[in-house]
């Protein structure tokens, strides 16, 4: 799980040393010119995971789950997971709301009182501090960085559990739910990063991230889940539904995406399934851009907004020679102009700094 503005702040080699710039074979006049053209040696560091949410089963069952199925509804940006355990069918539903800036998870079962879960949060952040009080898990901290004198980034996360079952705070990072029919989890995270369009400050605001995320959680917790879900769908579809793609011979397929991909690679799918997969892949690309680049956020990096750990591959940073083009070629060509805005604003914010 990632918060898009969380990263550390300097460029180091594989041994953790700040990289030096030395050109012993060049005349001083040339090295001076090179130094004048370069940016700050202390780059923005790594885009990092803020942590992981675990939902641990406490049913005591030793059986294997059956009929396990995961579905991404890209028409509405809703993910569902279903499985059967000891004759009970369990369902989870996930979405991330752009208008309300939070993530929701809803757990249900078709048998009364069947939900017995531990909701826990862990973090790879060495300086992250996790606590739990009642139905709420809170984490605050800052990334572990190499230039604490110039990196003032702070982060906060709050996770609230709402249920008709019994709730209990356990240890420092668990909310235990017992005998529930429904469990709803709301999570929001944030930092004190603030984009600056001039050079008047260093991108770090005086905002206290915990105050911001706590207010968000309080706001969404007071609303009806279905209303929050509908607001998310409406916001997403205002962009997504602008474009449809029709290919000759394509019809809706009920086969799994894994089956379609395997058959397509081996050239054994039907024409109808092949055309359907091409449409699905096209719309999946639009789904990814909508999900990773919205107004008011940083632009999608070379891994979009999805990365694992403290040191993901290639930081993940912005490669101006390839990844920006790969991410954003469909912004204008597939009628997602608003998704281009974060990249344009990010570039404009760099201009005053040379």
Predicted regions span which residues?
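Aromatic-residue-lined binding/catalytic grooves and analogous aromatic/hydrophobic interfacial grooves
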Residues: 1-354
């Amino acid at each position: 799980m990632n918060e898009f503005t969380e990263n550390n702040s300097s460029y180091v080699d594989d041994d953790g040393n700040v990289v030096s710039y030395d050109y012993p074979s060049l005349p001083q006049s040339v090295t001076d010119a090179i130094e004048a053209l370069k940016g700050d040696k202390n780059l923005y560091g790594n885009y990092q995971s803020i942590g992981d949410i675990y939902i641990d089963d406490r049913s005591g069952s030793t059986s294997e789950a059956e009929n396990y199925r995961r579905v991404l509804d890209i028409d509405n940006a809703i993910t569902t997971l279903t499985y059967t355990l000891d004759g009970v069918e369990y369902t989870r539903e996930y979405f991330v709301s752009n208008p309300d800036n939070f993530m929701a998870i809803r757990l249900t079962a078709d048998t009364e009182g069947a939900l017995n879960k531990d909701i826990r949060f862990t973090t790879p952040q060495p300086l992250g501090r996790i606590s739990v009080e009642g139905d709420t898990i809170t984490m605050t901290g800052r990334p572990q960085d190499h230039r604490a004198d110039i990196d003032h980034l702070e982060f906060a996360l709050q996770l609230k559990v709402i249920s008709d079952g019994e709730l209990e705070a356990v240890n420092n990072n668990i909310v235990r739910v017992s005998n529930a029919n429904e469990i709803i989890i709301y999570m929001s995270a944030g930092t004190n990063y603030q984009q600056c369009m001039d050079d008047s400050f260093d991108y770090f605001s005086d905002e206290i991230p915990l105050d911001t995320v706590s207010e968000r959680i309080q706001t969404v917790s007071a609303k009806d889940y279905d209303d929050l879900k509908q607001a998310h769908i409406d916001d997403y579809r205002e962009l997504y539904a602008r474009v449809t793609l029709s290919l000759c011979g394509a019809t809706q397929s009920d086969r799994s995406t894994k089956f379609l991909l395997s058959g397509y690679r081996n050239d054994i799918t039907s024409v109808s399934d092949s055309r359907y997969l091409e449409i699905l892949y096209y719309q999946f690309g639009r789904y990814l851009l909508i999900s990773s680049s919205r107004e008011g956020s940083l632009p999608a990096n070379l891994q979009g907004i999805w990365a694992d750990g403290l040191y993901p591959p290639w930081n993940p940073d912005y490669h101006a020679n390839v990844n920006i083009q790969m991410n954003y070629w469909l912004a204008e060509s597939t009628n997602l102009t608003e998704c281009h805005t974060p990249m344009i604003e990010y570039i404009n914010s760099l201009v005053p700094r040379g």
